[in-house]
Amino acid sequence: MGEVNVASSDETIVKVKDGIMIAVSAGEAVIRAKIGKTSAETNVIVVADATAEQVNGFGEEYINIYGRSYIQEGRLNLDQTANAVEIGIGGGNLSVTLSSTANSYMRIYIDESTEGKRLNIPVGIRKYMLASELEEGYHKIRLAKATEMQDACWDVLAFEADRFTCVREKSDLKIEFIGDSISVGYGVLGDFGQNKSVENSDCTKAYPFVAAQALNADYSIIAWSGICTKAYHWEKNINMAELYKHVSFTNTEEYAFDFSPDIIVINLGTNETSYLSRNLQYADRFLADYYGFLKYVREKNPESYIICLYGMMGVNTLIGGGIEAACAEMDDEKIIYNPLVIKSDTSAANGHPAASAQIEWGKELADFIEK
């Protein structure tokens, strides 16, 4: 039959000696075997074991955390929309004990799943099974908070597993999303004519999460239903100019701005459209408000590309024109106004965009970013 030649694509990860694979460091390599004209290859993932104490210390050398978060009294606080945690295990079971301030929902993604499993998270402290009886070998489990910040906040107390491993590092691509109800998946699972509810809302079906998932990107979403850039309309005590400065709505410490996103996507102006209909004089003020916020975002993120979107629930020319003028006034080649061809949609609950439209926008945004 002849001699079988076995080689590794990266000997800093895996070496092959006398036909035996030897792990060198964490990472991924391709092992290729060839005999005569026949060949085969397989991917090999090398991960280090982790202890329960390491994982439950919530350090990102052992787990991945998505979105602004903080640790308080030994608990990992997940307030933000679509906050997520990725855990690595070596097969078997994984559970989490967490506390929720209100009825909410989670999506659980195992390995390369993109749809995930939706799980109801009632108010209070409970233990939840995230994965069970997985075959031996490395598995990545992501739990994502599918409910927006103003409806529920979570505290993670502890994870339990048969065998923890260090999770593989996140993507180098980082995207920050700033928005309103569109960005949180408000009513996205509901039908036109229905009222919005926690049950028919899901931020994992909104375009920011869809785009980040399509790009396998690290992400952070700062969004709040009903919010304006600086005006107070549906929300009487909060605007994005203030919310963006803080870790979260419940943790008002000044945010460190250490995420350093490659790309920032701002989607504001929809609530100002409604506000303007009741406060006509605001037309003269909006440009200055949006420009001031855009300038602050640039100040805190000097190297990021900034994409300003508008029109997913219809267009008011005064608002759209104000956003475009603010972008032009910045005179910054890394600030881009509305690069997508957006077809507005109001076919879901309370006249908000449906999942089908959100998914399409997310994919279009991902395609634009890739190009």
Language model features: what each stretch is:
Residues 174, 218, 304-305:
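Proline-centered loop/turn at the N-terminus of a beta-strand
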Residues 47-178, 182-200:
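N-terminal secretory targeting modules
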Residues 244-371:
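Alpha-helical cap/lid subdomain in secreted, periplasmic
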Residues 5, 218-220, 334-337:
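Conserved beta-strand segments of alpha/beta enzyme cores
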Residues 1-53:
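Extracytoplasmic soluble-region selector
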Residues 8, 15, 38, 79-81, ...:
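Residues that act as N-cap/strand-start positions at coil-to-secondary-structure junctions
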Residues 82, 149, 188, 193-280, ...:
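Conserved SGNH/GDSL esterase-like catalytic core that processes O-acyl groups on lipids
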